[in-house]
Amino acid sequence: AEFHIAQAVGAILEEDHQNGLAHFLEHMAFNGTEHFAGKGIIEYFESIGVNFGGNINAYTSLDETVYRLSEVPTTREGIIDSALLVMHDWACGLLLLPEEIDAERGVIREEWRTGAQANRRMWKAINPLKYPGSQYAKRDVIGDTAVINNFAYDALRDYYKKWYGPDNQAIIVVGDIDVDQIEQKIKALWANVPARENRGERPLYSVNDNEQ
């Protein structure tokens, strides 16, 4: 089965001094949650044949962040419960511990370095032409290295609490499952997911026409 949680939260919501936090949060989802300490998510699911990278992964774009568990065996109800518990923790239970944040700064820097190739430079050069005068031309998903290196721990926690909440989330489960049972399990788990703190209204950024 496939278990996805889609957050309507991407780099487009960042202020300049936050550029990179949406992507950083995505990485932190695999570095300790309420019910899965440390690398517990990866360790548990790899123990049942669900591989990190191919089947346990996530991505961040300008408009969304999506986390997924793919090809999860559904032969045992306990596995289904664990997969839904991971979705719950990604929704509201990231620990965001200082030592894990600092360790991940280096991972993101390396991702930034290895991605600084010709295609990325072309992307950055072309975007202002594709989206003239728009926030979409300005924002870079992987972020600003100065922000990545120096943001305060609470800056990431505040961003998480501000934007991650039930009104910005969708749970998708596809596979050989009992739909009614899964729906009831999701409702029970999400009953205690808190509303967003310091709730921000999600801005809608337009894309202007160009001559082409």
Predicted regions and their residues:
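Extracytoplasmic/secreted cell-surface and envelope-processing proteins
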Residues: 37-38, 179-183
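M16/insulysin-pitrilysin zinc metalloprotease superfamily fold
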Residues: 32-35, 69-104
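Active-site alpha-helix of zinc metalloproteases
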Residues: 15, 19, 171
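Divalent metal-coordination and catalytic microenvironments
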Residues: 23, 67, 87, 108, ...
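Generic, well-ordered alpha-helical scaffold segments in large soluble proteins
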Residues: 28, 86, 90, 111, ...
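Helix N-cap motif at beta-to-alpha junctions
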Residues: 73-76, 176-180
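Non-catalytic beta-strand/loop surface segments
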Residues: 1-13, 35-76, 100, 114-168, ...
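Active-site SXXK
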Residues: 19-33
